[in-house]
């Protein structure tokens, strides 16, 4: 489910955001009005989506994080194809990994999911 189409571009954007978190955001007071913070929102989207489409969602999020917005809880969303039960069972037995994200369906169609970090 991880975005593997453009790993180089994702790695560059991820490194920039992690640098911002470590060197700039660490020395300022917490002022993000949302949960997850805008930088975590960006990292989660870059993990699951194409970097170019993720940048559009990230830009909208950053523009909405201003003093005139009430903020709140706003998890990122992504569109994914649901794997078949047989395929997911085979993958589960072969390479079990630690669960890091929950994908919670937003609608009954199960095409759009909220990304929630465990």
From Swiss-Prot:
UniProt-annotated location(s): Cell inner membrane
Membrane topology qualifier: Peripheral membrane protein
Keyword Cell inner membrane: yes
Coiled-coil boundaries: none
NCBIfam families tied to this protein: membrane protein insertion efficiency factor YidD
Provenance organism: Helicobacter pylori (strain Shi470)
Pfam family, one: YidD
Gene Ontology CC terms, in alphabetical order: plasma membrane
InterPro entries in the cross-refs: Membr_insert_effic_factor_YidD
Its biological purpose: Could be involved in insertion of integral membrane proteins into the membrane.
Major subcellular site: membrane
Family membership noted in the UniProt record: Belongs to the UPF0161 family.
Name by which UniProt lists this protein: Putative membrane protein insertion efficiency factor
Keywords recorded for this protein, A-Z: Cell inner membrane, Cell membrane, Membrane
Superkingdom of the organism of origin: Bacteria
